[in-house]
UniProtKB/Swiss-Prot annotation:
Main location as per UniProt: nucleus
Entry's family note: Belongs to the FIP1 family.
Motif (Nuclear localization signal): 397-404
Disulfide bridge partners, by residue number: none
Descriptive protein name: FIP1[III]-like protein
Listed GO MF terms: RNA binding
Subunit structure: Component of the cleavage and polyadenylation specificity factor (CPSF) complex. Forms a complex with cleavage and polyadenylation specificity factor (CPSF) subunits CLPS5, FIPS5, PAPS4, PCFS1, CSTF64 and CPSF30.
Location(s) in or outside the cell: Nucleus
Region described as Disordered: spans on this chain: 250-272, 289-475, 534-553, 880-900
Compositionally biased spans, kind Polar residues: 261-272, 534-547
Length: 997
């Protein structure tokens, strides 16, 4: 015999086909009748030749003990002197061989062995590979390697076809099948086990086509291009470790008493070994016949078919309908029994697995088939390990106990068969219950693969009933609903409540205006007082009663995506609102309530606990502590969290540019009224300044201390005042400077408020009320203005680079000059603006301070001298760049003070209109280049315009010659410099060239 390439080829006689003969036909005739054990030693010599034992054919001569002992002795002697590392010494005991005597094999077929009539999948052991000892031990089970079978080496023990065997000794009466089949298998179960091994499982695409019979793992998106290949395992010794002992086959004596265990054993078999078959046979051998208890299985070729027959489909449909009909009558014992067994019954892979089931277990099997995937294209993936099954069972039982049931996968008893998702494409629909009458199944627990939710009536006061919507685009192999969130299924209300408890706020796309500035008041308009934040104190009932929508019509606040100012923001309504909320008789913030469209800023700084830095008196109450706030920092901190509960500004759906303009456009220089203090008549203007700006401590955010957006005194000052702080002058009946282009109100509301508190006056794009009261001294206004605007000068590039008067600021967005705002081109008619110095009694020192502040750092050409130029109002009327007779050009050597400049004022020539105005004012009340207008307004004198035009022409002629001379001088200097540059550049070039050569 030729040696093989395999290292272990000498262990087996590959060219001699061993097969077992009938166990009862021939025995090894031994004197003792016992074979305690044997040893097989294989030795290869140093030359690499494999020494094999030839099998000698003897005519039915039994082997005797002397020959066996002699062969064993020779083998032992050879193994002692073996120097090869490849020697293999296998010692096995034949204790199990007593159950079935070993049969001898004869070499009668050209050195081979005739076909055996015994089982071909039994383990075969050759004793010294001799004819006397070549016996088969059928009780040792399957082979550890594939080489022990007569099949070609490329075949496996699973390829053995039991039907071609002539004799089937395991069918003989009184024979223990465990002697022929391991792990409690029988003939049919072994066939079912061997068939699908190594078959490729196709992963189908699409979603929601089926419900897996046991989906114990997280759902994953299937990849249609992936093919799962189940490898064929050769290590059969691992199987007893992974298989529980109770998965033994049920013998014929126990078949009548334990029908349920059939499916149980079948589950363990198929779940552990992962056999994806559609039809399984569970049964055992009867005593006197080769038939099995229960229904007979389908033919072998149909056992593992991937598609079910039409009759099977009809049967499955009937079973589903029966399971739904019996679902309402299910007793708790069935649920308990189902949960106690875990998913063992659900893992039964086929509808025919209910063989041998009597009447007692009909309902039990119906439950097991209820959740199994029995559609026409069902595929069963490899089930998880036993540990995963146990873990999932424990988790499911615990979840069921927490929610009031034993098992979380209790069927949806309130749904009929037409609404159950049975795993087919035809069932992929929306299940909606939009009937106006209450659902009789409401209040029951609805189960799914992911958890439970309670469809309770208490969550729906008068709203529509719950809607279970099937989302075709979300689910991948399992059920998904639109309300699914945070790992469980919720209704809309439960979902939002869960988010409220988890995050502390609601993100439901509803504007703050619609729900009364309460972020928790999403679905209940007339809700009771609820905490806005931990420090909230304002009452929402007034706003809720004024809300202009219904919950049923606008549940999610779609009507409030856009800002709509309806009855709520009328002036009269605002006035009543102030009286009710604050207990006062006067209108405190008419400007903010009707003018500013930011919905949540009205109550932003209200707090239960009064600030520690605020000024308190007897009338001070905690609710009114933070009412008047500096709104400062909105332009710098525009993207900070607008609400104390952390909701971003975007949630209120206010456009960014509108909010930016709102914050930058209102800055008043008067004092605001505060309810906690005594009335304004009891204070002088200076006292009001000291008493009313108590909230300078709010000028910086200190959220790291208390988590709220407050500001402190030693921070940078506010670039803009509070949007609700109006200029407080004399009962708030005057001195309101508005900007209609930034005022998002209707003209009717604006006129209504002005007619109520102000004098009627013409208005245009940049509204200036010419008819306002004149009882307030400009002195006090400028005093406060200078004090508030001064710290902010460093933050704006105002008019320092422009030629303008002290009060004429071209930058319309400056927060402190709302009193005099003009368009950028400065060409504004005179009647549209108002002179800032037209009031009596302001001090000259205030003018000096403002003058110095506005022009301190203005450096122009002229040997380092400060050039101060002021345009008069005639220049604004159209003669830009001209210095009128009321203006002057003055150079100071840097040391001149403002007082020295003012000494020259009386010597300045004045126009007719200024001379007329000087009769009504003190001489110290004037500033150079200023037009003093009377109350009714002064039109520009045509005579003065002509005079100014003539002077402008003279000035041009005077500087014309100077300009030409300067240009000529500059041109000559430029030519000389250019010649020198050319001369200086030529020499180095020639030198470099010479050096380079």
């Amino acid at each position: 015999m030729d040696s093989t390439d395999d290292d272990f080829g000498d262990l087996y006689v590959d060219d001699a086909k061993f097969q077992a003969t009938d166990a009862f036909e021939s025995e090894c005739a031994t004197n003792s009748g016992e074979d305690k054990g044997f040893e097989e030693t294989v030795k290869s010599d140093s030359e690499g030749e494999v020494k094999k034992f030839d099998v000698v054919a003897k005519d039915s001569s039994p082997c005797d003990d002397d020959d066996c002992a002699m062969n064993l002795t020779e083998a032992d002697e050879e193994s002692e002197f073996s120097d090869s590392d490849d020697d293999l010494n296998i010692v096995l005991k034949d204790d199990d061989s007593k159950a079935l005597p070993a049969s001898c094999v004869f070499n009668t077929n050209f050195g081979g062995y005739e076909a055996s009539k015994a089982s071909s999948f039994q383990r075969r052991w050759t004793r010294n590979a001799s004819a006397n000892n070549a016996c088969i031990d059928p009780s040792l089970g399957m082979s550890q390697y594939r080489y022990s079978f007569p099949n070609p080496w490329s075949r496996t023990p699973f390829d053995v076809n039991l039907d071609v065997l002539e004799k089937k000794p395991w069918r003989d009466p009184g024979t223990d099948t465990s002697d022929f089949f391991n792990f409690g298998l029988n003939e049919q179960s072994w066939k079912d086990y061997c068939k699908p091994l190594g078959r490729a499982i196709e992963v189908r695409g699409g979603t929601l086509e089926r419900i897996p019979s046991a989906d114990l793992r997280r759902p994953r998106d299937p990849d249609p291009g992936v093919v799962i290949q189940i490898p064929v395992t050769n290590d059969v010794e691992e199987l007893p470790v992974r298989t529980p002992e109770k998965a033994r086959c049920i013998t014929s004596n126990e078949a009548s008493r334990s029908d349920v265990s059939h499916s149980y054993g079948s589950k363990d078999l198929n779940s552990v070994y992962g056999s994806p078959k559609d039809e399984a046979f569970v049964g055992c051998q009867e005593e006197n016949a080769g038939s099995f208890s229960g229904e007979k299985s389908l033919p072998t070729e149909n056992c593992c078919s991937r598609e079910a027959t039409p009759s099977d489909k009809e049967m499955l449909e009937k079973e589903k309908e029966e399971s739904v009909c019996n679902s309402d009558e299910t007793d708790p014992s069935s649920v308990e029994r189902e949960s106690s067994l875990g998913d063992r019954i659900r893992l039964s892979p086929t509808s025919s697995s209910s063989v041998g089931i009597n009447e007692e277990s009909d309902d039990y099997e119906t439950e097991s088939l209820k959740d199994s995937a029995t559609d026409d294209q069902r595929e069963v993936s490899t089930p998880p390990q036993e540990a995963r099954l146990a873990e999932h069972e424990a988790i499911s039982i615990k979840r069921g106990e927490d929610s009031g049931t034993m098992h979380s996968r209790h069927r949806r008893s309130h749904e009929d068969s037409s609404k159950r998702h049975c795993g087919r494409a035809g069932y992929a629909r929306y299940v909606k219950d939009a009937s106006p009458t209450p659902d009789p199944g409401r209040g029951k627990k609805v189960g799914s693969l992911q958890g439970l939710y309670r469809d309770s009536n208490k969550n729906w006061q008068n709203g529509p009933p719950i809607t279970l919507e099937r989302d075709e685009t979300e689910g991948k192999g399992v059920h998904y609903y639109r309300e699914k969130s945070h790992g469980r299924l919720n209704s809309s209300v439960d979902h939002d409540r869960h988010r409220e408890h988890r995050f502390g706020w609601r993100n439901n796309k509803e504007s703050s205006l619609g729900r009364g500035f309460d972020h928790s008041n999403s679905y209940k308009c007339g809700t009771h007082l609820k905490e806005y934040t931990s420090r909230s104190s304002f009452d929402l009932n007034q706003r809720n009663s004024r809300s202009s929508f219904k919950e049923e019509d606008d549940r999610y606040g779609w009507h409030h995506r856009e800002r709509k100012y309806v009855h709520e923001r009328s002036p009269i309504r605002a006035y009543e609102n102030y009286k009710e909320r604050n207990g006062c008789d006067w209108l405190r913030e008419p400007y903010y309530e009707d003018c500013i469209p930011i919905t949540d800023m009205d109550y932003r700084y209200r707090s239960e606990n009064s600030s520690a830095h605020a000024i308190h008196n007897l009338k001070h109450s905690p609710e009114n502590d933070l009412y008047c706030r500096r709104r400062g920092g909105y332009d710098y901190n525009l993207h900070r969290d607008r609400y104390e509960d952390g909701v971003h500004r975007v949630e209120s759906r206010i456009p960014f540019e509108l909010a930016y303009r709102e914050m930058r456009s209102f800055a008043e220089v008067e004092m605001r009224e505060y309810q906690g203090y005594k009335r304004h008549e009891e204070f002088s203007e200076i006292e009001k300044r000291h008493h009313y700006i108590h909230d300078w401590h709010l000028d910086r955010f200190v959220s790291e201390e208390d988590g709220y957006k407050y500001r402190i005194q030693d921070g940078w000052s506010s670039p803009s005042l509070s949007l609700r702080d109006s200029w407080y002058t004399k009962e708030a009946k005057g001195d309101f400077r508005r900007d209609d282009t930034r005022d998002f109100r209707t003209p009717e509301a604006y006129d209504s408020q002005n007619n109520h508190f102000h004098k009627a006056a013409p208005r245009d794009g940049w509204t200036q009320n010419l008819g306002r009261s004149h009882n307030v001294s400009v002195k006090d206004r400028l005093q406060y203005d200078a004090d508030w605007v001064g710290p902010d000068r460093g933050r704006y590039n105002m008019a320092d680079d422009m030629q303008c008067s002290m009060r004429e600021v071209s930058n319309s967005e400056h927060p402190s000059y709302t009193d005099e705002i003009f368009v950028r081109d400065i060409r504004v008619p005179t009647h549209n603006r108002m002179a800032t110095k037209q009031r009596f009694g302001y001090l000259q020192s205030h003018i000096h301070e403002n003058d110095e502040r506005h022009h301190r750092s203005k450096k122009l050409r002229g040997d380092g001298h400060a050039f101060i130029k002021r345009q008069d109002h005639v220049d604004l009327a159209g003669r830009q760049g001209k210095v009128s007779n009321q203006s002057k050009k003055r150079f100071s050597n840097g040391g001149d003070t403002i007082e020295q400049q003012d000494v020259q004022k009386p010597r300045k020539l004045m126009g007719k209109s200024e001379e007329k105005a000087m009769q009504n004012r003190d001489i110290n009340d004037k500033e150079e280049g200023e037009i003093i207008e009377e109350v009714k307004g002064v039109e520009i004198d045509n005579e003065r315009i002509q005079e100014s035009l003539k002077k402008m022409e003279k000035r041009r002629e005077r500087f014309k010659g100077t300009k030409l001379a300067v240009e000529a001088t500059f041109k000559s200097q430029t030519e000389l410099r250019a010649k020198a540059d050319v001369t200086n550049q030529q020499r180095p070039v020639r030198k470099r060239r010479w050096c380079a050569s």
